[in-house]
Curated annotation (Swiss-Prot):
GO molecular function, one term: phosphoribosylanthranilate isomerase activity
Gene of this entry: trpF
Similarity-based family: Belongs to the TrpF family.
Keyword Manganese listed: no
Protein name: N-(5'-phosphoribosyl)anthranilate isomerase
Organism: Nitrosomonas eutropha (strain DSM 101675 / C91 / Nm57)
GO biological process: L-tryptophan biosynthetic process
Amino acid sequence: MRIRVKICGITRLEDAMTAVHHGVDAIGFILWPQSERYISPEEAGQIVRYLPPFVQAVGVFVNPDKSWVEVASAAAGLDLLQFHGDESPDFCSQFHLPYIKAVRVRDGLDLLQYAQCYEGSKGLLLDAYAEGKPGGTGHIFDWKLIPSGLSLPWILSGGLHSDNVVDAIEQTRPLAIDVSSGVEIANGIKDADKISVFMQGVRSCENV
């Protein structure tokens, strides 16, 4: 089965085009101004213009105002919303675009119940938990905490890079994976060689 890939934290057109060249399915833009990988909606929109058909533009938000989501998604030309904070199901589902909900996985969190709460989403993005950080920690979490029988599709995230992505896929068999810092040379600056090696690892796991 083909594994979907999103490269997140894109800030440069050249990095987006490199990702597209290597067959990614989605490009993620951090639309949370406090992030070191923040990009303005207008700048994101200039990149989205060059994305080919079937490559999704995903906007990442953290506890935003409704108006910010509406303005930013329109200016950037987004296809999908990703909520990475404490947004409620009602908040996430009020927009005209589909969404995925990030969850920071840790001991004691009932992912089965969480999935039921966000049943209107297109899926859950499973990320590592770190106190006071909504995401982008660069750390993995204990993949054994992922239960079988989740009612939603899910995306594996958190600390993935070329040295662990094969193990991650073999152990968890996700629908999709999400990477950011694992293919960077600096915050928001991707590395073409790292993207290439990472994608080779992903593709080696398909049809196995």
